[in-house]
Amino acid sequence: MERITSLVFFASFLIIFVSGVNQTRADSCDESLGLCETCDERCQAKHGPSCISKCDGEVGMLSCTCTYECGPPLPPKGNVCSGGTGMCSGKCPYKCCDTSCAQKYNGGRGFCNSFGNYNFCQCEYPC
């Protein structure tokens, strides 16, 4: 009798665990990152190495779309503001931009964004 009770308890625990894991799976999200120049690098800088970048649209006006794993929506924590720290340099384009934003804005994250021939360092931070 004790063995059956233990088996029922284990089976119930397993069912609860599997259904909980299934609910926490992340969805796929898309974000447009502007023109296609350095699309893959910008996508990975913003959403990590597991994201997928693609360029599509009309010839001459290809736009960068980044697909990444996103979880359920987070509860509102306040506003997210944007700022900048100038231009991204060729010496250290992405890491330096992120570092500059972290130093300039409390909780800031940075990424390089191309617009025409210019490569701007854009920051997002809680405000």
Swiss-Prot record:
It comes from the Eukaryota. InterPro entries: LCR (IPR039641). GO terms for cellular component: extracellular region. Disulfide bonds join C29-C70, C36-C55, C39-C64, C43-C66, C81-C127, C92-C112, C97-C121, C101-C123. GO terms for biological process: defense response to fungus; killing of cells of another organism. It is found in: Secreted. Keywords: Antimicrobial, Disulfide bond, Fungicide, Plant defense, Secreted, Signal. This is Putative defensin-like protein 180. It comes from Arabidopsis thaliana (Mouse-ear cress).
